């Protein structure tokens, strides 16, 4: 679903609503509840690495790097309402900027609850988000891969899932000179 659907939304907007796209914000809100203390909705190794790496967005022909979760703001999502949203690096921005050269600014926003972020900080602080191998009882293990093995399997979360998600694009540009 994501990435993918945001490319479809952008292509549709470019074809039917804009002559030039100037600003693109991809917004991703998971307002659901899987009733687990901590779980990721897709591969934990990828999810945790995405969130803990530096943010990256495109502005006026340059890629601008930020500290992880440094930039955030409250955005309002359809059928969900306002949620704190964090600027992240997401690979789909790179292809969208390349394929739509009139884009002046492109950003990716994702929501996280405070409880999720607290768990994430603890995971980082105790070294479980590390991707370099460590020695454990004479074996080399990667802490993040070990964590992935003990966390709930994302494919099994749907059964008890409640709530809504919202993924979309907020686009500004011009059509017929306006």
Could you say what each language-model-derived stretch is?
Residues 16-178:
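C-terminal catalytic/substrate-binding lobe primarily of soluble NAD(P)-dependent oxidoreductases
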Residues 1-9, 14:
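Short alpha-helices
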């Amino acid at each position: 679903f994501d990435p993918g659907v945001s490319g479809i939304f952008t292509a549709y907007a470019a074809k039917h609503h804009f002559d030039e796209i100037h600003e693109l914000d991809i917004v991703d809100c998971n307002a659901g509840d899987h009733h687990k203390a901590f779980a990721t909705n897709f591969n934990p190794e990828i999810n945790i690495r995405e969130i803990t790496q530096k943010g990256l967005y495109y502005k006026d022909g340059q890629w601008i790097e930020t500290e992880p979760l440094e930039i955030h703001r409250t955005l309002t999502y359809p059928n969900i309402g306002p949620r704190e949203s964090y600027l992240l690096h997401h690979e789909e921005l790179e292809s969208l900027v390349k394929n739509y050269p009139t884009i002046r600014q492109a950003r990716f926003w994702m929501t996280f609850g405070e409880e999720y972020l607290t768990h994430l900080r603890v995971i980082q602080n105790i070294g479980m988000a590390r991707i370099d191998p460590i020695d454990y009882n004479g074996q080399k293990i990667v802490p993040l891969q070990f964590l992935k093995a003990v966390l709930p399997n994302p494919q099994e979360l749907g059964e008890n899932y409640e709530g809504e998600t919202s993924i979309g694009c907020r686009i500004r540009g011009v059509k017929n000179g306006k």
